[in-house]
Amino acid sequence: MGNSHRGFESHALRMGRLVYSVIGSLDGYVDDAEGGFAWAMPDEEVHAYVNDLMRPIGTHLYGRRLYAVMAGWQTLGTSPDESAVTRDFGELWRGADKVVYSTTLDEVSTPRTRLERSFDPDAVRALVAASDRDVLLGGPGLAEHALRAGLVDEIGVVVAPVVVGGGTAYLPDGLRLDLRLLEERRFANGFAALRYAVVG
């Protein structure tokens, strides 16, 4: 693998696509059997790469649990004592719209956020088509709905150098997709990034 800035530049020029991007283990999980994901925490180099992937994103799609985690970025990354990479991510997150899918939440706690009761593939397709920026899927649950509906244009995985043996899989069982490699990159801490276009 090698660094591919050209891969990111071509990504940044393609707008209005639905992207699914995760940090996961080599054996395909976003968390382990106990729900832990400390092993997936990026260092500064990986975090900077994730920030670059965020720059074309105009809207985030979340389920309830991931939204509860990510909502912390409304205040995280706002202190001058935090690293430049952390502040950059916070600014990118706060600058994007969010859609939260939940049947149990009564309200959302962050600006630029709306609540939807169900994931409607036709509505998501229309959202992406009307957007001049990319839309990012957050979490395997929403991703399964979108993948099975044929909505996803790109899948990105930052692979952590760990095998966890079980947990929440980032791809659903029984799904077959043909992919085209867009970018591969490796990092000093042993993480590796892969981005694929969904072609069929």
Task: Specify the residue positions occupied by each region the protein language model found.
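Enzymes that bind and transform nitrogen-containing heteroaromatic metabolites
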Residues: 11-200
